[in-house]
A protein has these predicted regions:
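Helical element adjacent to the flavin cofactor pocket in flavoenzyme catalytic cores
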Residues: 157-185
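N-terminal FAD cofactor-binding segment of flavoenzymes
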Residues: 1-30
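Hydrophobic alpha-helical scaffolding
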Residues: 2-5, 108, 145, 169, ...
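Short acidic-hydrophobic surface loop/beta-edge motif
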Residues: 31-35
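Rossmann-like flavin
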Residues: 36-40, 46-150
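Hydrophobic (often cysteine-bearing) scaffold residues that line and stabilize catalytic clefts
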Residues: 8, 114, 118, 131, ...
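Flexible hinge/switch segments at interdomain interfaces of large molecular machines
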Residues: 149-159
Length: 185
């Protein structure tokens, strides 16, 4: 997700914009989830997953999830306010620097968590096995690695995008080849 948004924190989306390449995207909200315990259809967005937690795991797990999401939000705010490709530290002017500081200072006491694996946040906040497996699955989908080896900034970006009310997923029409062709152009 994030290729079709402008601005976007998706590094690939930023590179495609710098290259003036547009990719035709198929947008969708739902997907099928298969777990050993159960399988279900799910839509991205905060409420569909909260409802699924409540139905599958109960109120205590929902409270645990809400606490976890609250711990991720400050990190998402930091990551979403740092321009990945928009400007280089070498040419960041004073006003851009002040604007950046204004955006990240409210959450700066949480910034050290960005240097740890995402599993660190999970270990601090989630005990429910289903929720832990869920985050491990999302980590694998983003990085190809388990949550304890996945970059926290990448996951904070995912959580800020996937759990918004207007969230959606994207797939390039024509598959990965479409992305490769756009980059080669």
């Amino acid at each position: 997700s994030g290729l079709g948004r402008n601005p976007t924190n998706n590094p690939l989306g930023q590179i495609l914009r710098l290259l003036n390449q547009n990719v035709d995207l198929i947008k969708y909200k739902g997907w099928k989830v298969l777990f050993p315990e159960t399988h279900f259809d799910l839509e991205v967005g905060n409420n569909p997953f909260r409802n699924k937690i409540k139905n599958l795991r109960g109120e205590d797990s929902l409270k645990e999830w809400d606490k976890f999401i609250s711990s991720v939000k400050p990190l998402s705010n930091i990551v979403n306010n740092i321009p990945l490709l928009a400007s280089s530290p070498q040419n960041l002017n004073l006003f851009e620097g002040l604007d950046l500081a204004r955006k990240i200072l409210p959450n700066i006491n949480q910034a050290f968590k960005l240097t740890k694996s995402f599993g660190y946040l999970v270990d601090e906040n989630l005990n429910d096995p289903f929720l832990r497996n869920w985050v491990d699955l999302l980590s694998f989908l983003i990085s190809g690695l388990p949550m304890h080896d996945t970059n926290t900034a990448a996951m904070a970006t995912l959580f800020s995008e996937w759990f918004e009310p207007e969230a959606y997923l994207e797939y390039p029409r024509g598959g990965s080849e479409t992305i490769v062709n756009a980059l080669v152009q």
